[in-house]
From Swiss-Prot:
Organism per entry: Saccharomyces cerevisiae (strain ATCC 204508 / S288c)
Ranges of compositional bias, category Basic and acidic residues: 166-189
Extra facts: Present with 8970 molecules/cell in log phase SD medium.
Main location: membrane
GO process annotations (BP): autophagosome assembly; cytoplasm to vacuole targeting by the Cvt pathway; macroautophagy; pexophagy; protein localization to phagophore assembly site; vesicle organization
Bilayer topology: Single-pass type I membrane protein; Single-pass membrane protein
Summary of subunit composition and partner proteins: Forms a complex with ATG9 and ATG23.
Stretch list, region Disordered: 161-194
Keywords linked to the UniProt accession: Autophagy, Cytoplasmic vesicle, Disulfide bond, Golgi apparatus, Membrane, Mitochondrion, Protein transport, Signal, Transmembrane, Transmembrane helix, Transport
Gene: ATG27
Ranges in the topological domain labelled Cytoplasmic: 221-271
Protein name (record): Autophagy-related protein 27
């Protein structure tokens, strides 16, 4: 029984560690969260002291940077609380760590990427943390916009590039190199053909529309003051004449373009 429990625990730890690799996670790999870390702080007056709260965030193990001195090296979230009394050095009164071996859950919505960290031990208590990354690709670093620490839950909202989807250029860098480019080139050729076909189709539709309008206007002018039946008969007659004369008209246009019209040939005599 003990061996089964140990094996299950070992497997669960391996699963969690692997899931923290953002490039291997189905959702996290789509976002820029693996490129950035942040150290934010807020200051508030707590007379006679000043309290400073700092939050160190480095979600993905691919982004290897050193955390603050008081935090652990494998922390993905670390909270520090410093208290400063007048004329004295700052004293760190609280440190809470969420390392990369704890469980977590990822959720993506239209407005944010949310990462929930579960079960960090702080003294005799267990805490969860909810990190909400809102996209702003005009910012170079993430900024903490709000934070709450109530009961046994911590909520942090950050705005910046981490919550933004990766660009196509980033996806190409993670692709197959030249093979991916060849595939793209082959994929673009049918698009060009489709564009040419679309242009010809629109030209034909415009010509048909203008012809229809022309026949309707001429029929209306010739039957002005008459009944709808007169207009209908005139329109059908002119449409029929147009359709029957269309092949001869096209033949005449082609002949003139190629310089082989009967009028041109009639202007010369054999020597």
């Amino acid at each position: 029984m003990v061996s089964k429990t140990w094996i299950c625990g070992f497997i669960s730890i391996i699963t969690v560690v692997q899931a923290l690799s953002c490039e291997k996670h189905d959702v996290l790999k789509k976002y820029q969260v693996g490129k950035f870390s942040s150290l934010t702080s807020t200051e508030r007056d707590t007379p006679p002291s000043t309290t400073i709260e700092k939050w160190w965030i480095n979600v993905c193990e691919e982004h290897n940077v050193e955390p603050p001195e008081e935090c652990k090296k494998n922390d993905m979230l670390c909270g520090l609380t410093d208290v400063i009394l007048p004329g004295k050095d700052a004293i760190t009164t609280q440190i809470i760590d969420f390392d990369k071996n704890i469980g977590f859950n990822v959720e993506e919505t239209e407005s944010a990427l949310t990462l929930t960290l579960k079960g960090a031990t702080w003294g005799a208590n267990s805490f969860d943390a909810k990190l909400e990354f809102q996209c702003n690709d005009n910012m170079k670093q993430d900024e903490l916009t709000s934070h709450t620490w109530a009961d046994k839950s911590i909520q942090l909202t950050l705005k910046g590039p981490s919550g933004c989807l990766k660009s196509k250029d980033d996806d190409k860098k993670n692709g197959d190199g030249d093979n991916g480019k060849d595939g793209d080139s082959e994929g673009k050729k049918p698009a060009k053909k489709a564009g040419g076909t679309s242009w010809f189709t629109w030209l034909f539709l415009y010509a048909l529309l203008f012809t229809l309008i022309y026949l309707m206007v001429v029929s209306f002018l010739n039957t002005r003051g008459g009944s709808f039946q007169d207009f209908r008969a005139e329109f059908i007659q002119r449409s029929t004449q147009f359709l029957t004369s269309l092949p001869e008209f096209c033949k005449e246009v082609v002949s003139r373009i190629l310089g082989r019209s009967t009028a041109q040939r009639g202007g010369y005599s054999a020597v």
